[in-house]
Regions:
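C-terminal segment of N-terminal export signals and the immediately downstream linker at the start
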Residues: 110-136
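Noncatalytic modules at the cell exterior or secretory-pathway interfaces
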Residues: 158, 219-238, 561-563
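Edge beta-strands of jelly-roll/beta-sandwich modules across compartments, strongly enriched
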Residues: 237-248
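N-terminal secretory signal peptides
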Residues: 1-4, 36, 40-43, 49, ...
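Surface-exposed beta-strand/loop patches in noncatalytic accessory domains
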Residues: 127-139, 166-214, 538
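C-terminal functional module detector
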Residues: 252-254, 444-596
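Extended extracellular/luminal ectodomain segments enriched in beta-structured repeat modules
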Residues: 152-159
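A metal-dependent hydrolase metal-coordination microenvironment
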Residues: 262-401, 406-425, 429, 435-450, ...
Length: 596
């Protein structure tokens, strides 16, 4: 590494400078520049290094403007840049983008990684070329950092690996976490056609060819043009994030893309109009899950489910991965968990092969656009775990575009309690004519053992076991949630002259007319209790016998209770001393009372 002593600059010494993240161009000269960008002070020659560092007791000036002259294969180019707090060179264009993140999600595009076409390209076992790129991202980096990759003709396979540092951080601060994905030559336009895969932080490497692709990625020809590896620095440590990306192009005959795998059928045999049990938030090895599709299906059947939905994080590669796993007893729907930095949303039952983009925040005002895309693709928009405690899980987009809301996610926890309380407040508002009500659903969000597929599950009254019928039932609120298929219940409200309403329906009676509310529940075990919740709060409660079976009846009027819903709760851990109810075993959507 060359040492440079400034001809003017009070004798400060600077180490070698290299364009951050562009390691195959060797810096040959460094100059300090003024505000106008012209090279006004020669610093000296530079060798390889990766950052500007103090090689003696020097003060490193953050914000120092520099111009680096690079040479590669006889070609010379110039990069203007600014030093960050770690002495890393950031291109001037990148600095401007880092300081203006008002655009969609904040984007930084680096200079391209270039390859030369191999002489033996097109042969069955052609050569391969590898480029490695290193760089540094400061705290406050954009959500997405794009690395253009110039792919020449004759490439059979593109393979990418990456790593980043994970330094110890002060208590109360986030460490480094960085996702990865790729877009092909069709571009990175939001909602465009260039998406070829995403693995989040679940993998450190992936490969794509015509014949096959790593789970989470889409197989297909590797066409010439500008591809983009995309980094998603989810959280960045106070020290910043040092990353390294390696791209390998393998040349040879392109191969043949296999015929597209069969998508799941949209109807199963079913039982006609009936209650169907399902889990519509599930992950496999196609995102950050550990189960294979076959293992998920086996677990679903063991849980007594009638339908499931595959919902991988920001990818649709699983849509063809369930071929041969469905049957008369199990309907498999396709979808996606759209995983943004401001909350996650389940796209339930979208058309197979339809990808929904995730690269936006609430401040970008783009969610409505993509919620409409979900519905155009035949899906439902269901915010997931709105009060989840993981980074980026908290829901920030509001509920105006939602078709339902996931109020119970996996094992019942305090964030589910908060979500249910918030949801119940929306029911109260809707009962007074302030907005519409959203049906509640529950899903397991199961990723791996010991997480249980079907805990919880949504039980839907549908005309048959089909995508359309199930979605109609969910959208109408004709559903309830249970922790397992061992639990069964019926819930109804009955008025005079034979009037009757079930879950999600309205019993149209006068305000003073007597209404009888009936619940039958079984399979809940001992120690549980039943609660009837209305717009006035809890108005009825009773313990469940040790047999786990109960028939409960309560009388009210529409003027006293605008709606009623049922909860079956397990005993609280503290015996009820705190007044906080125990975990949920089952819950229903409301039955509405009154003419309006």
């Amino acid at each position: 590494m060359d040492l440079i002593t400034a001809a003017a600059g009070r004798g400060r010494e600077y180490g070698a400078v290299e364009r951050a993240g562009y390691t195959h161009w060797a810096p040959t000269a460094v100059a300090r520049t003024g505000l106008g960008g012209s090279a006004d002070r020669r610093v000296g020659a530079a060798g390889r290094g990766g950052a500007v560092r103090s090689l003696s007791a020097m003060e490193l000036s953050t914000g120092l403007s520099v111009r680096v002259t690079h040479a590669y294969n006889g070609v010379t180019r110039v990069s203007d840049g600014t030093l960050d707090s770690g002495g890393h060179l950031m291109q001037r264009r990148d600095v401007l983008r880092l300081s203006a993140l008002a655009g969609a999600a904040g984007v930084l595009t680096l200079d391209p990684m270039t390859f030369t076409q191999a002489d033996a390209a097109g042969t069955a076992d052609g050569p391969e070329q590898t480029r490695t790129l290193s760089g540094h991202l400061p705290t406050g980096a954009p959500d997405f950092v794009y690395v253009p990759v110039e792919v020449p003709r004759g490439v059979r396979e593109i393979a990418v690996s990456y790593s980043y540092d994970k330094p110890t951080v002060p208590a109360g601060t986030q460490g480094n976490a960085c996702d990865i994905g790729i877009f092909d030559e069709r571009g990175t336009e939001l909602g465009g056609r260039g998406f070829r895969g995403w693995s989040g932080g679940a993998r450190t490497e992936f490969a794509i060819s015509a014949e096959e692709a790593t789970p989470g990625y889409l197989a297909g020809p590797v066409k010439a043009g500008t591809w983009h590896v995309v980094l998603g620095p989810y959280t960045v440590a106070p020290q910043g994030l040092d990353y390294k990306i390696t791209v390998t192009l393998r040349y040879g005959a392109p191969g043949t893309t296999p015929e597209q795998g069969a998508y799941p059928p949209q109807r199963a045999k079913g039982r006609g109009r009936a209650w169907y049990r399902g889990d519509s938030h599930l992950h496999t090895v196609h995102s950050d899950g550990k189960r294979t599709p076959a293992e998920v299906v086996a677990a679903a059947r063991a849980a007594g489910l009638d339908f499931i939905t595959t919902t991988e994080h920001n990818t649709i590669s699983s849509h063809t991965a369930f071929e041969g796993l469905w049957g008369d007893d199990l309907l498999i729907l396709t979808g996606e968990e759209i995983t943004t930095r401001n909350g996650h949303v389940v796209a339930l039952g979208t058309d197979p092969g339809v990808f929904i983009d995730w690269r936006y925040r609430a401040r970008d005002n783009r969610f409505g656009q993509f919620a409409r895309k979900v519905r155009q693709a035949g899906g439902l928009v269901i915010p997931a775990h709105p009060h989840g405690t993981c980074v980026g899980c908290n829901w920030k987009f509001g509920f105006n575009e939602a078709d339902a809301v996931e109020v119970w996610n996996a094992d019942f926890t305090p964030d589910d309690e908060i979500t249910i309380s918030e949801w119940d407040n929306t029911l109260v508002a809707a009962s007074r004519g302030d907005g519409r009500w959203l049906p509640a659903v529950g899903h397991s969000d199961a990723h791996r053992e010991p997480q249980v597929v079907g805990l919880p599950q949504t039980v839907v009254l549908a005309d048959d076991l089909s995508r359309t019928a199930l979605q109609e039932g969910i959208r109408a609120g004709r559903s309830w949630i249970a922790e397992s298929s061992k639990i069964d219940l019926t819930f109804e409200a009955v008025g005079g002259r034979g009037k009757h309403a079930g879950i999600g329906e309205r019993l149209k009676v006068g305000g003073a007319a007597e209404v009888t509310v009936r619940l039958k529940v079984s399979g809940v075990g001992s120690g549980c209790s039943v609660r009837f919740i209305t717009d006035q709060g809890q108005l009825y409660g009773t313990p469940v016998p040790d047999s786990g079976e109960l028939s409960a009846e309560w009388r009210t009027t529409a003027s006293y209770a605008a709606y009623v819903r049922a909860e079956v709760r397990r005993a609280p851990a503290d015996g009820g001393a705190s007044g906080i109810p125990g975990p949920m075993a089952a819950m229903t959507n409301p039955i509405w009372l009154g003419e309006r």
